[in-house]
């Protein structure tokens, strides 16, 4: 660094496909360390790519850089026509090893893409080939000299070892000249300054730079919740900045978190690694109370045989509070025949864990107006922090009818909500029906193309959030890039809930990613439909053990409201054949029809599946078609596999004759038609 140069600080945020969840202790720790290493390696190689771009510019216009070598050089490169083309692949968050550089660069720079192409090829190379040179074959000794093919590429070797020839085979060997031309590590002492603006400034200092190439610093952090710092409970290391200065200012520092940082000095030749983790830092600010629960709504209502009513209330969990929610308090009270509410002392109350977003209220009186209040509670030491209360008004028995629900907070006004099944907007992402082809379970995800003319690529990322057999440990996220408005996801696992994010790629700005969830069916559901044999094996290649448990008394009821039909499907379980603990239920429903359906979207969803927790025996399906046969399958899920399916066919009721004439009045007269539920 040259002192006294007024260079601007540039922070290039890297869009990593890393999860920020806490690491699990135990068998998953090794997998977590491998994930940390792979993510860190990717960040370092992208910094090497950026350093190469700066090195090329120093060569071309060395006179300019004699007094301007490091400070501000990334800023300069970003604003330089040729250098910015070179930097573009270095910022790419997708896996370039799976894509052609030409398809990446030419849409961005149709006329002159040479700088982008050469930079992309360099990045692909260093992502596959580790730094350092292989020793001469005759130098190999011990196991390294064995005449075996123990590796094919460098990434198959641990640590800094490379896949090298020993004259009669290939083995993992320590390279020679590992640090030739590589800058020294920064000094391990990092200094923290909490600014009045709320930002955190992190500073470090460099040792003598033994390289003439520009040095780029990669800054990573990890954190844990709690009163005390803990490396065992910390997140993965995440790259938060890439800069040519010896400082960085971070804006997203949250109270109640213990942060650790580390820094690596990188040039085109590589790095000596990251500094040791810094001392822990925690903001001096006190954490805020949790936000009020959002989108409180009624998800299900069932009339029991004794005349009482059971309802399910759901809400959206907060995305990232200062402190995780410890528990939720739920209060409910009622009034009869439009009279005043019951006294406060007769209010009912219960609590639910902070990670849950639903509660079941049982033994409600029919035809009563209820008020439900919800409040989030967190703890900071001995201090209890409470959110504002949110309330929901509904009428029992007819709760799923088209009666408007009123939701309000103590600090705000009243907000009108449509019922749960009517509130769903048109989703930005759609998922087709899973299908089995070429020996793989696949699914098509599609979306509406953005109107922004600068967007011609989409970064897609997908991973299993939960599986029926609890085999997601170590599962890595997959990602891809496409120019189309769809992508086919391949090699999926059976009986898993997947999350998919799609992010438009803009040349000079960061776009918001949209997300969608879908559930893959069990293998047995496709086995009977496929013309070719489908091998229903576990992930380790072993046939899943037989499960005898089977749902019983599968029944359905339908509520007709104007032109909408909502189905409530329920079942019971007999414990006699349950020799293994249940992990949930796999529910699959589909229309039984040979008619083609008119739909503007490709691969319209005719069959759908959902995985429910083991304590949920009811599924609500809105927007069913009138007078239509539906086939419902319910299976028990256990760690050993799926049980036999209980199958039943139901026909939805017809719409009342006047529904078509009344449909334009449904918002004006919501109580005009209230049929009793039809039961099967």
Curated annotation (Swiss-Prot):
This is Anosmin-1. One of its GO terms (biological process) is axon guidance. It is found in: Cell membrane; Secreted. CDD domains: FN3, WAP. Keywords: Cell adhesion, Cell membrane, Chemotaxis, Disease variant, Disulfide bond, Glycoprotein, Heparin-binding, Hypogonadotropic hypogonadism, Kallmann syndrome, Membrane, Protease inhibitor, Repeat, Secreted, Serine protease inhibitor, Signal. Residues 661-674 have a biased composition (Basic residues). The gene is ANOS1. Changing residue 396 to L: In HH1; phenotype consistent with Kallmann syndrome. Residues 127-176 form the WAP domain. Changing residue 163 to R: In HH1; phenotype consistent with Kallmann syndrome. It comes from Homo sapiens. Residues 642-680 are annotated as: Disordered. One of its GO terms (cellular component) is extracellular region.
